[in-house]
Curated annotation (Swiss-Prot):
GO BP term (any one): DNA catabolic process
Subcellular locations according to the entry: Cytoplasm
The protein's name in its UniProt record: Exodeoxyribonuclease 7 large subunit
Family: Belongs to the XseA family.
Top enzyme class: hydrolase
Keyword Transcription applies: no
Amino acid sequence: MLSSQTSSIFTVSRLNQTVRLLLEQEMGQVWISGEISNFTQPASGHWYFTLKDDTAQVRCAMFRNSNRRVTFRPQHGQQVLVRANITLYEPRGDYQIIAESMQPAGEGLLQQKYEQLKAKLQAEGLFDQQHKQPLPSPAHCVGVITSKTGAALHDILHVLKRRDPSLPVIIYPTAVQGDDAPGQIVRAIELANARGECDVLIVGRGGGSLEDLWSFNDERVARAIFASRIPVVSAVGHETDVTIADFVADLRAPTPSAAAEIVSRNQQELLRQIQSAQQRLGMAMDYYLANRSRRFTQIFHRLQQQHPQLRLARQQTALERLRQRMGFALEARIKQANQRQQRVSQRLSQQNPQPRIHRAQSRIQQLEYRLTENIRSRLSEQRERFGNAVTHLEAVSPLATLARGYTVSTTTDGKVLKKIKQVKAGDIMTTRLEDGWLESEVKSVTPGT
């Protein structure tokens, strides 16, 4: 009985190792809520404590590289939410958890919900850049969805009045905090789309805690922003506050004031641009008029200079000058032609081509003779080599052997018969003669002596 169970006997070390691997592989990383007790921090900087509830407790460790990211000092009796890996300390067989992050219980649960919703909507593609709508440029009417009594609305209106006083603004007042806030925000977005009064929406509120901003982490609000046909600019809290609405919106502004800056034109800048354009237009007009005036003056002087009498006098003077130039040029050309003729005659007498022609003809005859002799020599050499090759080939050719009375026999599969053991009585063989082939059947086989 004992021998049949030896394969399942564990040593203590192997047992603890097996249990540790099972815990780490099967459980993985989990979220645990509980109350802190027995909190200690030795010189190493690691934290050691116990997490407990009304009926159970578990040992916990949080190493220094993880606990330095915690933004508060854990206290005895404090309720916390811990993200941890479950393991077993093999030397003592103690089951424990290794904490990776820690948050106060209330805020931690909200953060967990935030991360879960963010992952869900991201997987559905609600954050994808391809769904983002461009903002109108310029905007002709701005819709604001926020609390009518909040500081955010005051900031938005103040910036719009300063930058673009003529820009129409429609306010869709809603609660931005509390249980009813998400539903009101959704209805305001749907109302703005149904009425179609504005071409861009600012959705937001002032700063606050995670709980204060939670309405903008609501799934209903996120889907309403995504479904809006009007481009939405999110403006929730301060620059460090990031909500689900910011990821879904077509554009995120760090603050409500920044959102107002984004959707509006700067009237002072527009005025400066108009003044600059007027100045450039005035300069261009002055340049154009001055240029046309110069052109008119040039044409007037040209018309005066082209009066028929003036033109006739100038043409007569020019004609006389041409006659003189033609006379001088003709005399110079005749003189140059005579000089050139003399030089050519001298050069021809000095460079008679007849001797050069004779030398070239002699050279050609020599080359022709050498070429002919070379061709004859090479041709004779090639004929001799060809004759030798033919003689050699005829000497080693199987056909020459056949002509002397020999034959070559092969089996049906083409193998040359060299020995009688390659055939037996009844086999068919083919015999090659000088002038053809014979096919014959082996009647008998007699070994040679």
